Amino acid sequence: MKVTFSLMQKASKQIDKFALYVPKSGVFPKGFKVATQATGVKKNGNLDLGIIRNVNTSRPSSAAAVFTTNKFKAAPVLVSKEVLEVTGGENVDAIVVNSGCANAVTGEVGLKDAREIAGVANQNLGKQNATLVMSTGVIGQRLSMDKIVPALSQQFETNAFKDDFESWLNLARAISTTDTFPKLISSNFKLANGTEYTLTGIAKGAGMICPNMATLLGFIVTDLPITPSALQKMLRSATDRSFNCISVDGDMSTNDTISMLANGAVDTAVIDENSQDFVQVQTQVTEFAQRLAQLVVRDGEGSTKFVTVNVKNALNFKDAKIIAESISNSMLVKTALYGQDANWGRILCAIGYAKLDNLQSLDDKKINVSFVATDNSEPKELKLIVDGVPQLDIDEARASELLAQQDLEVLVDLGTGSEECQFWTCDLTHEYVTINGDYRS
């Protein structure tokens, strides 16, 4: 299907994502404060430095993180990994993030710069190994330390840390690069004993997003008391079903980091892997992380559609995820969705070349593929393949209606088991090429 001028016009119309996805208020965990500043690293003068600080002293904090699998790990990734290895995740009280420069592929000098930033924060906290560092932006350039270090010191010296909504929103702004809106969510939850706690999440990312994370930074903070090992297990599981289940363009970056801090400001028993509350909190953190990860896809560079790829009835979760990932990363599928073309052949092709662990997960006589409406319109499901047989009499008018929607679900029923994976992706447009062609300029 050729992309018509009318389709290009439609894609060029800007969706007001800020109005749709940015909150106007929020609830935030006890004992955390944040600060931001425009240091001048970003050419446009926008906020480019952010700090999260734990100010609760009632008990030790815990930290956890999941990092990129890219072989060329950026300096801040290596330094943050060192901090967690040395401390075991105990008594980490701050995260310092800069945007505009990734401090990636910068060699020993990059490591020195990342350690210096952490050292400035540690000195002001009065502790060693108490700070995680993150960077995002252009790869291969050294940090402007003459701008970042004085600005970081100033935040501590002037006690610029606050805990109000606007300050948290500014933190989300400070870590943005090609993002069209700041990504901030927060929610209250209750434990079985009635104790209320809060999760706040911030993320950045709009391009170089694919499984095992990409140019993606995110952090979740909570006032629950959780042991470091339980927090790491919780975050790892949540990440596998959230940030590792999203794709914008299939590119994996050098800087991905998802971190989590728990400061124990809520007065309740410390949660470990054997606690009765562990499974409940893990489920809540996973669902929360999925909400945050979905915002990254909704901000996919140049995208016009948010697509849920739901693979169900697989032999195991891993194979369901492999197939969902294969569909989500297919350039041909993504461009067909942009062109509003019900090209089921591209979906089937992506399923067929998925590198499954167990070939019995896929039976070409059992597979079903459908488009599913995400609104209340009927018929809700448009079947494209039934028990391995392509449907030659597809209702093209209904297909056009579904593909014109901003939210769409692709449902794949493998019919070989009972496991399921949801993956989130977007279409690929002319605007994506424009944004990335002009990135450094």
Swiss-Prot record:
The alpha and beta chains are autoproteolytically processed from a single precursor protein within the mitochondrion. Pathway: Amino-acid biosynthesis; L-arginine biosynthesis; L-ornithine and N-acetyl-L-glutamate from L-glutamate and N(2)-acetyl-L-ornithine (cyclic): step 1/1; Amino-acid biosynthesis; L-arginine biosynthesis; N(2)-acetyl-L-ornithine from L-glutamate: step 1/4. The active site is at T215. GO terms for biological process: L-arginine biosynthetic process; ornithine biosynthetic process. Its main location: mitochondrion. Keywords: Acyltransferase, Amino-acid biosynthesis, Arginine biosynthesis, Autocatalytic cleavage, Mitochondrion, Multifunctional enzyme, Transferase. Substrate binds at T177, K204, T215, E301, N436, S441. It is found in: Mitochondrion matrix. The record marks T136, G137 as: Involved in the stabilization of negative charge on the oxyanion by the formation of the oxyanion hole. The keyword Zinc-finger does not apply. It catalyses: N(2)-acetyl-L-ornithine + L-glutamate = N-acetyl-L-glutamate + L-ornithine; L-glutamate + acetyl-CoA = N-acetyl-L-glutamate + CoA + H(+). GO terms for cellular component: mitochondrial matrix. The keyword Cytoplasm does not apply. InterPro entries: Arg_biosynth_ArgJ, ArgJ-like_dom_sf, ArgJ_beta_C. The record marks A214, T215 as: Cleavage. One of its GO terms (molecular function) is glutamate N-acetyltransferase activity. Its EC number is 2.3.1.35, 2.3.1.1. Catalyzes two activities which are involved in the cyclic version of arginine biosynthesis: the synthesis of acetylglutamate from glutamate and acetyl-CoA, and of ornithine by transacetylation between acetylornithine and glutamate. This protein may be expected to contain an N-terminal transit peptide but none has been predicted. HAMAP family: ArgJ. Belongs to the ArgJ family. Heterodimer of an alpha and a beta chain. This is Arginine biosynthesis bifunctional protein ArgJ, mitochondrial. It comes from Kluyveromyces lactis (strain ATCC 8585 / CBS 2359 / DSM 70799 / NBRC 1267 / NRRL Y-1140 / WM37).
